Amino acid sequence: MQCPNQNHMLVNRAMVVAALDSFEDARRIISGVLDLSRLTNTSVKGQHTNDTNYFSRYSNFFSQMPAIILNQLKCCIKAQVDDAVKMVLQKAKKVEVSKPVEKMLTFTTLNTYLGYPESTGCVMEYTEEQSGPIAAKLLITLLSSTLNAMVRPKSDPNISQNKIPRHYYQLKVHVGAQKKVNLTAIEVIRGCQHECSVVYCEFVRYSAYFAGLYDDQVAAILLYAVAAHNVQGFGARFCVLWALMCVRIAGFADDINIYIKHRGMSGLLPQLVEMKCLLGRGVNEIDVETEARRRLDVGSLSMQRLDENELRAAVRLIYSEELRRPVTYPLICDFWSSRWLWAANGSHSRALEHAHPELATRKEGQAYRKAVMEQWQHNPMDRWDGTVYVTPSAKLEHGKTRLLLACDTLSYMWFEYALRPVERIWENSNVILDPGSMGNCGIATRINGWRNGMPGQSFFAVDYDDFNSQHTLMSQKIVFEELFHHIGYNASWVKTLVDSFDSMELWIKGKCAGIMAGTLMSGHRATSFINSVLNRAYIICAGGHVPTSMHVGDDILMSCTLGHADNLIANLNRKGVRLNASKQVFSKTSGEFLRVAHREHTSHGYLARVISSAVSGNWVSDHTLNQQEALMNAIVCCRGILNRSLPGEKNPVVRVISRSVSKRTKIEEKTIRLLLSGRACLKGGVVYGEQTNYIQVYRINCRVERSEEKLPPYRHATEDYLNNHLADIEVMAVRQYGSDIADIMAQASWKKSMSTEGAEDVSRLSLQRDKTLPCLHCITEKETSLLPVRYGLFSSYPILMMLKDRIPIKEALKLAVTIGYRPQPNSDLELDLWGESNNSCAIEGVLPYNEATSLAQKLPCGGVVIQVIHNVYV
């Protein structure tokens, strides 16, 4: 038999067209029954209309589809239809009802759950029936029965005969698809074949419909099916067909996503939303240059029309709520000389160098800011004239591509200087600049506080349309003018910084294309700050000021009445603020914030999002994960998949992907399975499971093989830091244990840049079985969250922390004594000095991995079981 021909498969247009026809038929039925066009029309009109003709619509669509679909829907509502029949019989005093009456009652009951509320306003409030468990069950039944009936099995001979090469499915053109993916289709297929036969059989049965899909999409579809097929009775066939349909017809995935979220059912059906993510990165490409040039013409931009005085008053109110302590700025020379410590390692734009040749840096590979600052010997900040150099590129997100407008390193430095002291003392009352510090548990606690303290109100999530593009330059200037006015700061550089919004030059292909006429640059240092402040400011200007609201970037969740929400949306529309009308979610039971649906007793992340991340990896930089990074990434991603689908041993995801992770990390597959499943953990990590009696801990041994190629000779940032910012205790530590500290610091700065040139150090990973901790104590997650974060005495000495592994604990104690430390009897020196307890604990319940490990670090000892009261399936 001939080898399978990849090209033959990919050009088999008849196969692809047939697949689309089957899924389009299914889409037409589902969209008709659910009246999905009503929601998309709402996006255009901005106002809801009543649906009084559901009976004829149901009659029309159900007459065109196989009878089994309606019969299965009837099974879901049999009790409700029987009750309706009894009421009719009692009123009419008859023994049985006629077929037309029974049909009418069935359709009326269906509409009670799947229909829409009577509303003519901007915001729709669904009944408990329309957003409850029965409605969710009906939706699953409609989707599954329609797909089973309309999509006939059709297999690819190459798949059914188990003769497929490694790259049977085409890779995307982007370099990330070639080098950065974590899982390939063949790895997931083989994993299913050996460890999840029920999904593998369905894949073979419908394999012809996978023709023409990209490798990462096939991997994502199958991994989704592996994770979800045991959830809520979905079944493997439904999961495969549902994921296939959402990838084949991305517009339908959007429609169902809106339908579920609009009803506040995303917490009931988190496995069905955001399915468009399975398309992966590098899809729906945009014309970057055209999109960027559009921002040069104010006439082509659609920005808000808020009154300037109203906006200023709103911004002032925000600062009065969030900035209640004085802001102090360091000397600019000290800020500059400490750049090794604070510089983020984002991409460096060459546009700055075209305009200022004196700031030119080495041209090899992609430049990153930490490496650039090692090359700049003299401080360029005092010569800044306020010009911002903007370069456009495509930001490849899951399921879509956005325009990224990156700003230069010099402007980044100035806005870092301006904002860092402000962000440190920000209250995070309503405008939240650091949601990570709260975590999903903290957000859930705050939302439940609203739920209990504001009876009669509901959760309202406002959805802006392309929020960055709605900000005028004046509104961005107001954010900073009012900021400096509030903190009473009027240094000479303040005006330059504020005026810089009028001097943003767009650079394309090494040439200046013009001055930006409006919109917020998505790669500006202040993007998140500006968005978050203006987010709440626009709401205040529209009469939406409530104490119970949270704003992060373009995300909003508040607690209010229906009348308040309706008035708010109407006012925002009048003031020119663009909204996605069909995505305004008003719900009594569920509030979505930062892509997590929070219900009263549980919070839910969306499965498709973590599946796509687990498959595709990060395409932002060329840096390839080393073995240790790959292991940690696999543990976090796998825990996310387990939490969002089926936590526990019954989920075959761990077994399906363990061989691939073992191959990448060079760790024995048996050990990998223990770590991915949460039955064992790395030192300082957590295990998961009910009735855990002990914790098995593994210690990482990582041997680094230094690259033969030497680092570039530039290390000005390193030298400036060592010459100006070492404390006496750090000087002593460097003399004894850090003669090569400059090399270590420079390596940290250059690591990301050198990885793009193939000159990165190689890490060889091995794991050693460490101690087994008995579980002797128990504490709730809420009690743990109230414990203070334990900072070590040395935590404020970054160079000392870099040398931690070299300094024996007895010598560390001697250093600590020089700055006043006095050990107490039974002191935990590791914890007191370094602040790192490396405590491993057990999680009884469901928590995201990173939040669980953060809680573990608050505990005074290991071997503790943390009981989760509010499960967070993220």
Swiss-Prot record:
It comes from the Viruses. Its EC number is 2.7.7.48. One of its GO terms (biological process) is DNA-templated transcription. Keywords: Hydrolase, Nucleotide-binding, Nucleotidyltransferase, RNA-binding, RNA-directed RNA polymerase, Transferase, Viral RNA replication. It holds the Pfam family RdRP_4. SUPFAM superfamilies: DNA/RNA polymerases. One of its GO terms (molecular function) is RNA binding. InterPro entries: DNA/RNA_pol_sf, RNA-dir_pol_luteovirus. It catalyses: RNA(n) + a ribonucleoside 5'-triphosphate = RNA(n+1) + diphosphate. RNA-dependent RNA polymerase which replicates the viral genome. Catalyzes the transcription of fully conservative plus-strand genomic RNAs that are extruded from the virion into the cytoplasm where they function as mRNAs for translation of viral proteins and also as substrates for encapsidation to form new virions. Once encapsidated, the positive strand is converted to dsRNA by the RNA-directed RNA polymerase. Displays ssRNA-binding activity. Belongs to the totiviridae RNA-directed RNA polymerase family. This is Probable RNA-directed RNA polymerase. It comes from Leishmania RNA virus 1 - 1 (isolate Leishmania guyanensis) (LRV-1-1).
